[in-house]
UniProtKB/Swiss-Prot annotation:
Belongs to the universal ribosomal protein uL14 family. This is Large ribosomal subunit protein uL14. InterPro entries: Ribosomal_uL14 (IPR000218), Ribosomal_uL14_bac-type (IPR005745), Ribosomal_uL14_CS (IPR019972), Ribosomal_uL14_sf (IPR036853). One of its GO terms (cellular component) is cytosolic large ribosomal subunit. Binds to 23S rRNA. Forms part of two intersubunit bridges in the 70S ribosome. PROSITE patterns: RIBOSOMAL_L14. Part of the 50S ribosomal subunit. Forms a cluster with proteins L3 and L19. In the 70S ribosome, L14 and L19 interact and together make contacts with the 16S rRNA in bridges B5 and B8. It comes from the Bacteria. It comes from Synechococcus sp. (strain JA-3-3Ab) (Cyanobacteria bacterium Yellowstone A-Prime). One of its GO terms (molecular function) is structural constituent of ribosome. One of its GO terms (biological process) is translation. Pfam families: Ribosomal_L14.
Length: 122
């Protein structure tokens, strides 16, 4: 579960390292984001001379959560960190690489470009 003020690792090569969630997009008053949900965040830590700078406000999709996610077949999946990939307004990733595994739930939410860039899909 990702909520406001949650710090996430950025799992792409846009230059951002840490992202803080400031809004969960969706219906009015939505509190938590899970795998495949879009959030608005502010970059808290970034590499120099890269496209994304510190204090930039960006959209991102959650690809890994520490909170357990239950699948319809009864299987539970959990990751070691909370991670997101920065996306543009069209829903395409701004980076050209994705680091670490991503969840299969992203395919159901039409983030197939992120799935194709990922080295491993769980």
């Amino acid at each position: 579960m990702i909520q406001q003020q949650t710090m996430l690792t950025v799992a792409d090569n846009t230059g951002a390292r840490k992202l803080m969630c400031i809004r969960v997009l969706g219906s009015s008053g939505r509190r938590y984001a899970s795998l495949g949900d879009v959030i608005v965040g502010v970059v808290k830590d970034a590499l120099p001379n890269m496209p994304v700078k510190k204090s930039d406000v960006v959209k991102a999709v959650v690809i890994r959560t520490v909170d357990t996610v239950r699948r319809p077949d009864g299987m539970c999946i959990r990751f070691d960190d909370n991670a997101a990939v920065i996306i543009n307004d069209d829903g395409n990733p701004r980076g050209t690489r994705v680091f670490g595994p991503v969840a299969r739930e992203l395919r159901e939410k039409n983030f197939t470009k992120i799935i194709s860039l990922a080295p491993e899909v769980l």
